[in-house]
Amino acid sequence: MLAAQKQRLTELFQAAVAPLVASTDLQPTITLERPRDPSHGDVACNLAMQIAKPLKKNPREVAQALAAALLDNPANRDLIEAADIAGPGFINLRLTAASRQAVVKTVLQQGAEFGKSNLGNDKKVIIEFVSANPTGPLHVGHGRQGALGDAMSSLFQAQGYDVTREFYYNDAGVQIATLATSVQARGKGLKPGVEGWPESAYNGDYIQDIANDFLAKKTVSASNGEPVTASGDINDIESIRQFSVTYLRREQDLDLQAFGVKFDNYYLESSLYADGKVEKTVDALIKADKTYELDGALWLRTTDYRDDKDRVMKKSDGTYTYFVPDVAYHTVKWQRGFTQAINVQGSDHHGTIARVRAGLQALDIGIPQGYPDYVLHKMVTVMRNGEEVKISKRAGSYVTLRDLIEWSNGEVVDGEVRDLTRGRDAVRFFLISRKADTEFVFDVDIALTQGDENPVYYVQYAHARICSVLAQWTDGDEASLDKVDLSPLTAARETALLAKLAEYPETLQKALEELGPHQVAFYLRDLAGELHSYYNAERVLVDDEALKMARIALMSATRQVLRNGLALIGVSAPARM
């Protein structure tokens, strides 16, 4: 159902119910939904059941009165064809054929804008995702964050929000020191497992690559950063640290580029210390009497803000616990004007939510409860050749995002540099094809198949099929299809396809409200299914000119919606497969 149709039906129900509640304080909510069973009509409303009990009436009788009010008005006949009462008092409406067909004209006229709205009214939203430590290549978990975060950002942009995609670099922790000593050890000729190899060091082959470039005094640069030139002195641990961090930031940039993800801003954790923001945050909490000292440590009274226990802010050795810079960072987000902040992170961050929110509330600077929002995802298991893959040579202890993209792209041909679009499309679609809070098994073998079991192929093939049909239509102009008579579109498969097209705008809004971009992937799979069923049941280029033109318009509109949805989740829409 189109937005304009939904608004009109809402107003019609409001007018119909007004006389029934005029002498009461009732203010019923008009909720319109699509019935799960298409045979029940196009629109379902539970209004009668809302008001029947306070009116002391039978809900089915109330539903009959409301339905009669809708049908008796001649002005409604262009929109409503029939109304039925189902179950305890649901009102099921069947829209006119012209109303169902109107979506084709709307899609063709709006094109790439179909599904978008100004709901956000330019409200500033910051979505932080990936935010990997610069200590190694991106892994598949970062890939899931990238797919989720980028699609979520596009959802908010499509609904009129002013979105900033941000990558937060944790470049100030103990892991950075471990990275530096790992590179130093490699530079001295040590290898994992031999005497003198540092405990907890990083073992991947990439550490040797960094050491080689450091000894060669190479220069590297990364996003939003100055170039760094290695000193070449293997005893210069600070130069090793700076070079290694920048080297890996550059590598992560290349991974993200291959994945088709671009960030608007990169924020360094180290800048929070350099600018004094961490100290200022701690001082503000102390002055507000939200802290206390115990056993030589500084504690925050997080139990005052729904946490299950108070948390240490500064340990007895004088170092801060990891949630303190997080509080400072989110204070900065708020001060930058982001009234909504969303963090896409792994489920292992669950324990930080309460303490970060508690710290922000304790500052008492106007930040609302529940800020920021969190979308936590569960782990990804990678299967290849029927077996689980747990490590890669590149990283040493985990499967990298780059591995997954390359594996899903297919085999190397004659050693040539490949276009990684196929692999990127598969990984991005697969990684948002489940709810974030469910574990996901990524089967590379399925990603490489060209059949219905491969969801991205299934959707892209629907788009390519339409392109093939329209390429055979050589005696017309697509620009004029929005003027075609659509009344011949009466076949059952056409009705189902029309209904699915009309669901797209509401799908986007629901996905945004629930922070669930997986719903877009679900929708695209369903739309592709309707298209394939229609394609197998009906011919498009028939001899009947009026029917042919109506079906061509329907195909063009379906292609546009497939293209819009795929673009939103960062997947290509090929014309040929």
Swiss-Prot record:
Pfam families: Arg_tRNA_synt_N, DALR_1, tRNA-synt_1d. The keyword Ligase applies. Its EC number is 6.1.1.19. This is Arginine--tRNA ligase. Belongs to the class-I aminoacyl-tRNA synthetase family. The gene is argS. It comes from Janthinobacterium sp. (strain Marseille) (Minibacterium massiliensis). InterPro entries: aa-tRNA-synth_I_CS, Arg-tRNA-ligase, Arg-tRNA-synth_N, Arg-tRNA-synth_N_sf, ArgRS_core, DALR_anticod-bd, Rossmann-like_a/b/a_fold, tRNAsynth_Ia_anticodon-bd. GO terms for biological process: arginyl-tRNA aminoacylation. The lineage of its organism: Bacteria, Pseudomonadati, Pseudomonadota, Betaproteobacteria, Burkholderiales. A motif ('HIGH' region) lies at residues 132-142. It comes from the Bacteria.
